[in-house]
């Protein structure tokens, strides 16, 4: 994988404290964020959204001690590297509601709402966030401000709900009831683009409802 290793940025580190490091790469034509959450006490890690460019992701996994893959939802731009990850031996988890979207690429385990996923000494708690897809899910790293929201919440509003099985009212309720109760300092790490915070987005909910997207 020498040539692939050269394609990795000089640093993939995105956020760090004494317990956890978050690494980020941007892949594919839709510029998807792929995150690796790593426990600094044990070296264990999990990858969020095996989107694309599987060779690069496999190199990243080898470097960082990734043990499994978590999918925030089943849209094609978020699952393009899933077959290669599974072939390499990584378990891929997705919610049961979005599992049919992975019928062609496969999956290994269901992620339930409020499930605690242990990554070394870290605990990631799943938060079911329907709206963008029926089974979209976010992940909060307990004891940290980190909240991975997939395509549910972005800087400036909710994810796209123009798909056949998406629903704007549902995503608004999902964000308001399940994400906005987090503290204002919570860092939102979305599936595309830059980070934001709950405090930056929460005051604009009524604007989003009024505009309808």
For each predicted feature, which ranges?
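Active-site environment of divalent metal-dependent phosphoester hydrolases
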Residues: 30, 53-55, 74-80, 99-102, ...
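Hydrophobic residues in well-ordered beta-strands that form the structural core
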Residues: 48, 93-96, 148-149, 190
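Active-site HxH/HxHxD metal-binding segment of metal-dependent hydrolases
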Residues: 31, 45, 52-125, 204-211
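Active-site-proximal loop/helix segment associated with metal-binding centers of metalloenzymes
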Residues: 2-6, 15, 24-36, 40-42, ...
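Conserved beta-strand hairpin/beta-sheet module of binuclear metal-dependent hydrolase folds
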Residues: 11-64, 138-150
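Conserved catalytic scaffold of divalent metal-dependent phosphoesterases
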Residues: 39, 97, 107, 114-122, ...
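Conserved S/T- and glycine-rich ATP-binding loop of Class I adenylate-forming
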Residues: 37, 72, 129
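Metallo-beta-lactamase
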Residues: 128, 133-213
């Amino acid at each position: 994988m020498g040539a692939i290793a050269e394609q990795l940025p000089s640093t993939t580190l995105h956020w760090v404290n004494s317990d956890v490091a978050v690494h980020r790469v941007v892949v594919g034509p839709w510029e998807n964020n792929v995150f690796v959450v790593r426990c600094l006490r044990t070296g264990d890690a999990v990858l969020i959204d095996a989107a694309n460019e599987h060779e690069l992701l496999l190199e990243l996994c080898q470097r960082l001690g990734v043990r499994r893959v978590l999918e925030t939802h089943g849209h094609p731009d978020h699952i393009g590297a899933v077959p290669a990850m599974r072939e390499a031996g990584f378990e891929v988890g997705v919610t049961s509601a979005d599992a049919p979207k992975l019928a062609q690429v496969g999956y290994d385990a269901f992620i339930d709402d409020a499930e605690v996923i242990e990554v070394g000494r870290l605990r990631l708690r799943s938060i079911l966030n329907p709206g963008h897809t029926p089974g979209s899910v976010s992940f909060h790293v307990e004891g940290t401000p980190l909240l991975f929201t997939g395509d549910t919440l972005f800087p400036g509003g909710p994810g796209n709900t123009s798909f056949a099985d998406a629903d704007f009212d549902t995503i608004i309720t999902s964000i308001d009831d399940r994400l906005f109760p987090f503290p204002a300092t919570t860092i939102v790490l979305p599936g595309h683009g830059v980070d934001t915070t709950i405090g930056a987005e929460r005051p604009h909910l009524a604007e989003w409802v009024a505009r309808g997207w």
